[in-house]
Amino acid sequence: MKYDTSELCDIYHEEVNVVEPLFSNFGGRTSFGGQIITVKCFEDNGLLFDLLEENGRGRILLVDGGGSMRRALVDAALARLALQNEWEGIVVYGAVRQVDDLEELDIGIQAIAAIPVGAAGEGIGESDIRVNFGGVTFFSGDHLYADNTGMILSEDPLDIE
C-alpha cells in the first residue's frame, strides 16, 4: 500500500507525531507503514537477525542504534531475511550498508547514513522497550508511516482508505 505522509498529516494532525527529518530511503519500497517492534542495540545486529526470523506481515522493525555512523546495522543479508518473512520495513537510527543491493529489494528501509563497515553479531541489545530519537518517543505497538517526505507515528492505526 502507498502512503502519503503529507496527506496523513493534513487529515490526522492531532493524532500523529512527526519524526524529525533525519532519515533517507535506502530500500526499494519508498512508502511503507505498519505496527512497530522496537529494538535498542549499538553497533551489534545479532538481535535484529533473531527478530526478523519472525513473521513480519504488517510490522516494521524500528531500531535505535544510538545514531552510530561507525558500523552498519542493516546489510543486504538482513534485509533479504526481512523480505522473506514479509516485514513491511526497517527504520534505523544508525547506518546501513550495501545500498545498491538494498534498493533492489521490495522492502522499506530508512536510515540516517550508509557506511561500508558491518556490525558485530553478538546479539547484544533489548527489544520491546521505549526508545527515543528524532524528537519522538516510540513504543512497540505504535504505528509508523513513511515515504520520501518523512515519517509519522500514531498510537493507533490510521484509516487510510
From Swiss-Prot:
Q: Which UniProt keywords apply?
A: Cytoplasm
Q: Where in the cell is it found?
A: Cytoplasm
Source domain of life is: Bacteria
> Which CDD domains does this chain map to?
RraA_family
Q: Name one GO cellular component term.
A: cytosol
Q: Please verify whether the record's keywords include Transport.
A: no
GO molecular function term, any single one: endoribonuclease inhibitor activity
Q: Output the Pfam families linked to this UniProt entry.
A: RraA-like
Q: Which one GO biological process term can you cite for this protein?
A: negative regulation of RNA catabolic process
Q: What does this protein do?
A: Globally modulates RNA abundance by binding to RNase E (Rne) and regulating its endonucleolytic activity. Can modulate Rne action in a substrate-dependent manner by altering the composition of the degradosome. Modulates RNA-binding and helicase activities of the degradosome.
Its assembly, as annotated, is: Homotrimer. Binds to both RNA-binding sites in the C-terminal region of Rne and to RhlB.
Which family, according to UniProt? Belongs to the RraA family.
NCBIfam families the UniProt entry points to: NOT-MenG, PRK09372.1, RraA_entero
What protein name does the entry list? Regulator of ribonuclease activity A
Could you tell me which species this protein originates from? Erwinia tasmaniensis (strain DSM 17950 / CFBP 7177 / CIP 109463 / NCPPB 4357 / Et1/99)
Source lineage: Bacteria, Pseudomonadati, Pseudomonadota, Gammaproteobacteria, Enterobacterales
What is this protein's gene name?
rraA
